[in-house]
Design a protein with these regions (language model features):
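Ribonuclease/tRNase effector modules and their secretory precursors
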Residues: 1-128
Length: 128
């Protein structure tokens, strides 16, 4: 069984440790909120605990240079099943080349919406 310990003191810094009982070892993770993701997560009611659970147990998809962590109903571990409605359908988007959280939200059709996105993020330039 995994034990997750939230070590973050700064609202823009998400630090947590995962202790694996079988291995008797811990791994430390560090993610950084952008000002946008911090603002949106507080507006959408996605707190740090929900973000940590989605990052640890969610399915990961790489598209458009971003990592999408989707925590579906079946991904929630047994010891959190009594809080299933609190955690399910949480999506955390992380930059593909760093540990920066771009945004987070909740969506019932998250996997479908991510699959429909194009492979690359299109950037339009304003030409004079």
């Amino acid at each position: 069984m995994k034990k997750i310990i939230n070590n973050s003191m700064n609202p823009f810094d998400i630090r947590y440790s995962v202790y694996e009982n079988d291995l008797r070892d811990s791994l430390d993770f560090n993610f950084i909120h952008t000002s946008h993701s911090n603002k949106r997560s507080s507006q959408r009611g996605v707190n740090t605990d929900k973000i940590i659970i989605a990052l640890e147990y969610g399915n990961t998809t790489f598209k458009q240079g971003l990592l999408y962590y989707v925590l579906g109903e079946k991904d929630i571990p047994a010891h959190l099943q009594h809080h299933k409605n609190k955690f399910m359908n949480t999506v955390v988007i992380v930059s593909g080349d760093s540990n920066v959280i771009v945004t987070c939200y909740r969506s019932k059709n998250a996997v479908k919406n991510i699959k429909l996105k194009p492979k690359e993020l299109r950037k339009y330039l304003n030409c004079a």
